[in-house]
Amino acid sequence: AGHMAVEDIDDKVMREFIPWRRDYYASFEVLPKNAKRHPTDKTLQWDMMLGKAIVKWAASQGLRGNRPNITATYTPKKKRVRPAFETWEFRQLWRTMCKRIDTARDVRTRKSRELLKIYVLVLANSGFRPGEANKLKVRDVHPFIDEKGRNNYRFVVRGKTGERDAIIRSAANKRLDKYLTKRRAEDPAGLLFAMPDGSKVVTLIDQLNAALRDAGIERNSFGEKYTIYSLRHFYAVQALRNGVGVFEVARNMGASVEIIQEYYGKQATAAVFATRLGD
């Protein structure tokens, strides 16, 4: 709204704010620090929410007279999902992480890279949100034997949808077992994932970016950048392609069936259907 008086801001002004905000930096030759030429939908939603909060506060202070509350909202026309690794890309990332451990210049760097490797393994085979993984404790991981006689692990996960049990893919259990043995000896009551100095993981995005850069797979074929969340999406797509039911995938990931279908339904063709489609 610029220099507009707060009592003059209405729904029309707020709706016009979105295209103005989206295009504001488009013509800048040099961007200010931390500014993005093309703000994300999430940024636009946050800015809209902030503007409405300011107007609401002004109304509570009697600065808007009898003007009605702002009801305008911003909803992206199309929800975007962070890209999911293709199987060959994940394998390439895995091989690169292993090589980076072998070439680490010192003990601290080696430990950081070993942490990234097990962190990537668990998220890619469980669908955890990064925030959920960062809060896991050693005592939240419980061994069990499944109906096929395989040793596996059940996690007690606390996330934005509450507490749930989550099962990791059995293919990861041997490496996880080795890591768990190490963490139980170091700090049996501590965090499952801890930095080399013992502190909580905030984010491993810098380490992941370095590994992706070395692997030559920073972006997918559409130019979309891979992030830590891409591991969660990789899990969802692979599970659906392997024929795991939508309900089971949603429950394990702490998401709704609708979200799983909307976000991943077009990306993941189950093997049985892919076979039929290829006939």
Question: What are the roles of these predicted feature ranges?
Answer:
Residues 95-102, 144-146, 182-189, 194-199, ...:
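C-terminal secondary-structure termini that scaffold catalytic or DNA-interacting sites
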Residues 30-41, 45, 49, 60, ...:
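Basic, Lys/Arg- and aromatic-enriched nucleic-acid-binding interface segment
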Residues 52-59, 268:
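C-terminal flanking helix
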Residues 84, 151-152, 157-162, 246, ...:
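Catalytic-site neighborhood detector that most strongly recognizes the C-terminal catalytic loop/helix
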Residues 100-110, 126, 181-191, 205-251, ...:
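Short, basic (Lys/Arg/His-rich) helix/loop patches that form interaction surfaces
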Residues 8, 72-73, 96-98, 126, ...:
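Conserved tyrosine-mediated DNA breakage-rejoining catalytic core shared by Y-recombinases
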Residues 1-35, 54-56:
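Basic/aromatic-enriched alpha-helical hairpins
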Residues 79, 157-178, 188-212, 227:
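C-terminal catalytic core of Y-nucleophile DNA break-rejoin enzymes
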